[in-house]
Amino acid sequence: MELMVMYIVGLNGSPNKHGNTSFLVEKVLEECSKHGAQTTLLHIGEIMNDQKISYCTACSNPCSGACYKGTRLEETFETLKKADGIVVGSPVYFGSVSAQLKAMFDKTRRIRVNKWLYNKVGLGVSVGASKFGGQETTLKAMHDMMLVNGMIIVGDGFIDDDCGHHGVCAVRPATEDENAIKRAVISAKRLVEVCRATQSIR
């Protein structure tokens, strides 16, 4: 039986376009491609820098999306609407996600009402400056944002490997973190697997 082609979107939540977070998100996407998925990488720092109104002010209820209409953020949400899976990545900022990534998710009020991310499969990737540098609390923050949008969350495990943990956690420089790279490879298999298994409910 021919496998369905899944569409996986990576969100680099770092303000650095070519940094540690981008490297690991790209690694996951690269591995997803090996398992037959189509992929796209979006740099949230650039996208949010284009916003005239940087942060959600809850200016309307329900949200009309007026603050990002005609911008790259609107295009980003349209891309996410088409996705089967989403890889969310962020460096650790005081034990949580970057301001850019948080600001983007704060602006998902309209797409949340319309259930654009409902039953899409999410995976978290975080990079810290030290071994116990807030990576898991950063992943938890990502999980909260994904759960509130009705997403299905997977960790970094796979049946042929192990159950994994919260997601991909790395210590910078990520290019030298062999365990994080290994977890990225494993998590890609899991992400594509669950995307395929849940395709009928999206």
Where do the language-model regions lie?
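Short, glycine-/small-residue-rich phosphate/pyrophosphate-handling segment
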Residues: 99, 113-162
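N-terminal beta1-alpha1-beta2 submodule of the flavodoxin-like/Rossmannoid cofactor-binding fold
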Residues: 1-111, 159-202
